[in-house]
Amino acid sequence: MAASVSASCLNRLSSLAVVLVALASAASAQLSSTFYDRSCPNALSTIRSGVNSAVRQEPRVGASLLRLHFHDCFVRGCDASLLLNDTSGEQSQGPNLTLNPRGFVVVNSIKAQVESVCPGIVSCADILAVAARDGVVALGGPSWTVLLGRRDSTASFAGQTSDLPPPTSSLGQLLSAYNKKNLNPTDMVALSGAHTIGQAQCSSFNDHIYNDTNINSAFAASLRANCPRAGSTALAPLDTTTPNAFDNAYYTNLLSQKGLLHSDQELFNSGSTDSTVRSFASSTSAFNSAFATAMVKMGNLSPQTGTQGQIRRSCWKVNS
């Protein structure tokens, strides 16, 4: 009898999972690269201009925008919930406390520019998705087609930021976190390549440089010189070779055990993803292609479409 009940529960859970995947797929199917062609034909050029201007002034903006998009999408989908200034919302949670404010400032500025051209038409979620792509391109990385038509969430979801894998994650934990979002191991390794730009605080990698053995000794020593064991908010580039260029140096660094975060080096540590890291390290085009594919998949995670949510007039607050 117990076995029968258990089987029944499993069948119901399986059916629910199928329904949820189907709903997510249906929402993604409503996205289109031409969504604003008639309603706001200058939307994409306005976003691109804003991103390029910001990156020229501060190259790290590209990494900030990319990280915002990732952190937004991994919590209940790409709905701009992360952008809401809610004191008890997503921004207040541990995984998001190190997000640089400049990313939010740039998105809010671009939103204001888009609103001046097409008021009430273009969502913050779409602006962030496009800005992340344009930031990568501005730093020499690949481009990809961003599907559009996302709407903005009316709430922030602090309780689900645990979906974001921490920098202390093992390979198994990384694979599990990405699999939960229907992203495969190749997607995971490719998206981790976003760490070819940007910086991290010492507190994010102190355990790695003081306690791990799978790290180049000279590299660890150089980092310890600026990062006391007790931790600090000092910064180090995620890619020490070409920190402001979107390239495949992140992977060549991993081959030399120069991954800044524990989770970075886990990708090349005698595990199942070693061969993918070698492939990306030896071929920029292979990395660029896989990264673009993975970004499209991630950008299509559980969007709000149709009459769901709203088109916020300001990205930092819901419409009154």
Curated annotation (Swiss-Prot):
- Reactions it catalyzes: 2 a phenolic donor + H2O2 = 2 a phenolic radical donor + 2 H2O
Give residues annotated as binding Ca(2+) 1: D72, V75, G77, D79, S81
The Gene Ontology CC terms held by the record are: extracellular region
Q: Which residues bind Ca(2+) 2?
A: T196, D239, T242, D247
Q: Where in the cell is it found?
A: Secreted
Q: Where is this site: Transition state stabilizer?
A: R67
* S-S pairs: C40-C118, C73-C78, C124-C315, C202-C227
Which spans of this chain does the record mark as coiled coil? none
Entry binding sites for heme b = H195
Molecular-function GO terms, alphabetical? heme binding; lactoperoxidase activity; metal ion binding
Q: Which GO terms describe its biological process?
A: hydrogen peroxide catabolic process; response to oxidative stress
Q: What is the stated purpose of this protein?
A: Removal of H(2)O(2), oxidation of toxic reductants, biosynthesis and degradation of lignin, suberization, auxin catabolism, response to environmental stresses such as wounding, pathogen attack and oxidative stress. These functions might be dependent on each isozyme/isoform in each plant tissue.
Family (UniProt): Belongs to the peroxidase family. Classical plant (class III) peroxidase subfamily.
- Kindly provide the name given to this protein in its UniProt entry: Peroxidase 66
Which organism does this sequence originate in?
A: Zea mays (Maize)
The opening ranks of the lineage are: Eukaryota, Viridiplantae, Streptophyta, Embryophyta, Tracheophyta
* Designated gene of the protein: PER66
